[in-house]
């Protein structure tokens, strides 16, 4: 889920 940051945070 992309919450603000455009990184691989799933």
Swiss-Prot record:
Q: What is its EC number?
A: 3.2.1.1
Keyword Hydrolase in the entry? The reply is yes
Reactions that this protein is recorded to catalyse: Endohydrolysis of (1->4)-alpha-D-glucosidic linkages in polysaccharides containing three or more (1->4)-alpha-linked D-glucose units
Q: GO MF terms on file?
A: alpha-amylase activity
Name the keywords, alphabetized.
Answer: Carbohydrate metabolism, Glycosidase, Hydrolase, Polysaccharide degradation
Describe the pH dependence. Optimum pH is 5.0.
Biological process, per Gene Ontology: polysaccharide catabolic process
State the source organism's domain of life: Bacteria
What happens to activity at different temperatures?
Optimum temperature is 60 degrees Celsius.
According to its UniProt record, which protein family does this protein belong to? Belongs to the glycosyl hydrolase 13 family.
The further comment given in this record reads:
On the 2D-gel the determined pI of this protein is: 5.0, its MW is: 155 kDa.
- What's this protein's name? Alpha-amylase
Q: Which organism is it from?
A: Cytobacillus firmus
Q: What is the lineage of its organism?
A: Bacteria, Bacillati, Bacillota, Bacilli, Bacillales
